[in-house]
Amino acid sequence: MNLDDTIVAIATPPGRGGIGVVRLAGPEARTVALLMLRLANGKAELEAQRAHFAELVDPESGERLDEVVVAYFAKPHSYTTDDIVEISCHGSPVLLARVVELALAKGVRMADPGEFTMRAFLNGRIDLTQAEAVRDLIESQTLYQARVAAQQLGGSVSRRLQPTKQKLVNLIAVLEAGIDFADDDVSVLPAKEAIARIAEVHEPLAKLKEGFAFGKVVHEGLTLAIVGRPNVGKSSLFNRLVERDRAIVTAIPGTTRDLVTETVSLGGIPVHLVDTAGIRESHDEAESIGIQKSREAMADADLVLVVVDAHAETGHELDHQLISAAAERSAILVENKIDLGRHSVANGKSIPVVRTSAVSGEGIAELREQILRMVSGESGREESGFLTNIRQHQLVTDSLAALEAATNALEVRVPHEMVLMDLYNALRPLDDITGATTADDILNLIFSTFCIGK
């Protein structure tokens, strides 16, 4: 990738629309754009940081192609810090492709996927967590996902990491000074104090790592399986959560024989709901296959709703088996059909219990709230700057492991030269999170997941 090239790409999604945008960036962006434009009022130049009305023309034939609005962002006050020109025309794919062709004919290069954002990163306008947030913002499916991505784009992860990283740098500097100036009047940091200072770095990183479980759910969504015996109201509950009649509901046991899936937003978090076949002993081949899929869905889910019939006076043996299995994982016991009567079947199991009526809607709001509590855990939904992808999580994990190695080394009186190796191993991953020292192949992999025009 040559940062001196001028690049072009369509910045709006594929397909027809009212407006389409073609973006040019680089040293020749303004010059090339002017060749394709006939500015209103006879203007000869694009004024920086302004929108201009113009006619789009073929530079060779002079043919008028469209009426457009052109925005010129002069460097360094642009997304990439290069000169950028954005041409907004009518959103015909043919017309947008023609604009790109005209630019390519003047020596401009087609942008690689994510190249505009990669230039913003390489030119120091954003760090790597902010670049990842651009992608997350584009791909967000809920308002809460968009809000989290916007916080990341504003530098929330970097701001949260910076004080911790600075403490580590300061500790390294003190230990280095003790070694470099051992013959001078420089005191060596006692091992006990060094261990305490490592703990001050370790604690916030451990908390950041803890919050990844919630950050991952925000980013990827949560899979929630609804399981239970036949006719306990699983499909009715599913329809209540989906807020429409998505699953077939009848009084006949075994109506649901295959998995029914739907994605809903609960508190801004995408929840992938799975309605399953009622679990029981069955000699029907089709139903047996559905029951096996139910058990697999329960095993694969992030959260399980075990639905039982609260109207039944005594709990069924299979209910207790499902409750016992669910107690070993993240689960909620739903005592349904409370409109017909209430008989608790929880029997003291250590999982949250919510009582509902899928028919009347009673308890459904409480169920949604309990699901969100289970998802949020102790990380807290209000705290900004949490990790949202595996790359960031693994780097924090690597840093924590190196800090623990440094602590162990100090406890057995290993020379500070060896301790410093562990501390540098803890610092490098923190630099990699923001992209301060990330290798080119990793950068190429990250930015290749972006769309062409971003």
From Swiss-Prot:
EC identifiers of the protein: 3.6.-.-
Protein residues bound to Mg(2+): 235, 256
Gene Ontology biological process terms, A to Z: tRNA methylation; tRNA wobble uridine modification
Top EC class for this record: hydrolase
Binding positions (GTP): 231-236, 250-256, 275-278
Residues engaged in binding K(+): 231, 250, 252, 255
GO cellular component: a single term: cytosol
Domain TrmE-type G: 221-376
Cofactor: K(+)
Main location (coarse class): cytoplasm
UniProt KW keywords: Cytoplasm, GTP-binding, Hydrolase, Magnesium, Metal-binding, Nucleotide-binding, Potassium, tRNA processing
Domain of life of the organism encoding this protein: Bacteria
Subcellular localization: Cytoplasm
Binding site for (6S)-5-formyl-5,6,7,8-tetrahydrofolate: 23, 86, 125, 454
Pfam families in the record: MMR_HSR1, MnmE_helical, TrmE_N
Entry GO MF terms: GTP binding; GTPase activity; metal ion binding
Cofactor note: Binds 1 potassium ion per subunit.
HAMAP family the record matches: GTPase_MnmE
Description of how the protein assembles with itself and partners: Homodimer. Heterotetramer of two MnmE and two MnmG subunits.
NCBIfam families, per the entry: mnmE_trmE_thdF (TIGR00450), PRK05291.1-3 (NF003661), small_GTP (TIGR00231)
Assigned protein family: Belongs to the TRAFAC class TrmE-Era-EngA-EngB-Septin-like GTPase superfamily. TrmE GTPase family.
Function: Exhibits a very high intrinsic GTPase hydrolysis rate. Involved in the addition of a carboxymethylaminomethyl (cmnm) group at the wobble position (U34) of certain tRNAs, forming tRNA-cmnm(5)s(2)U34.
Stated name of the protein: tRNA modification GTPase MnmE
Gene: mnmE
